[in-house]
A protein has these predicted regions:
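Residues forming the ATP-binding cleft of Hanks-type serine/threonine protein kinase domains
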Residues: 84
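Basic, Lys/Arg-enriched alpha-helical interface segments
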Residues: 1-64, 72-79, 87-90
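Short, charged interaction patches at domain edges and termini
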Residues: 69
């Protein structure tokens, strides 16, 4: 099992989504899967990012709800860095 690290920006993103009425059970499920496996199943469409987010991964919790993370294998950590809509994040 990986150690979860929540960035301050991720925590703020979650609060904003809660305020907007998003179903937090969906992100909890995704986070649990990341914690256990380090990745998400294909239905989340996980993929690597490029540019400023090189070495980061993104997946879709819903079609316009994303989660971004970075895996640190040596440290046995997964950093949850951002979550939100495409327009929130990019």
């Amino acid at each position: 099992m990986l150690q979860l690290v929540f960035t301050n920006k991720f925590k703020k993103d979650v609060k904003l989504l809660q305020k907007r009425g998003y179903d937090m059970e969906l992100i909890k499920k995704a986070i649990l899967l990341l914690e256990v496996t380090g990745n998400l199943p294909s239905e989340y469409i996980p993929h690597k990012l490029a540019g400023n987010y090189t070495d980061y991964w993104e997946a879709h919790i819903k079609p316009d709800w994303l989660i971004i993370w970075k895996l640190f294998i040596k440290e046995n950590e997964i950093w949850l860095t951002r979550t939100g809509t495409h327009s929130d994040l990019f």
